[in-house]
Amino acid sequence: MSARIIMVTGGQRSGKSVFAENMALRLTEHPVYLATAQILDDEMRRRVEAHRERRRERWRNVESPLMIAGTQLADGEVVLIDCLTIWASNWFFKLGEDTDAALAEMKAQLDSLFGRPLTYIIVTNEIGLGGVSENAMR
């Protein structure tokens, strides 16, 4: 059996995470939530806390901004990855201008994950459907 992959995409703050969480809970009693965000400012802290509060005890929460393939998972589990866009950004920031190395690392991790018989619900951003930042990323 191969991996089942479900993509959930939409604009910034469009309800993607809630939609994906509800889908995961319909598929299994205790899904795995693989969070990729890093808390770098107060806004992100509030958003992460809201996500944690919403999930509570039914979820097994794993926070991994980079090494998602190292997560201990049992065959057949439902895994929500939130968010693929942030995860990719984390790799690009970590490796700087070495785009080829970042892409190779991401591909290796996804190949490792998707080689398992699990269901993945992957949240990603539809770039261009969200707001425009008032300041440059650093």
Name each model feature, range by range.
Residues 14-21, 77-79, 111-120:
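Short, functional N-terminal and low-complexity linear motifs
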Residues 24-26, 42, 83-86, 121-126:
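Short amphipathic alpha-helical segments, especially helix-boundary/capping motifs
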Residues 50-52, 79, 138:
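Short, hinge-like loop/turn segments at secondary-structure boundaries
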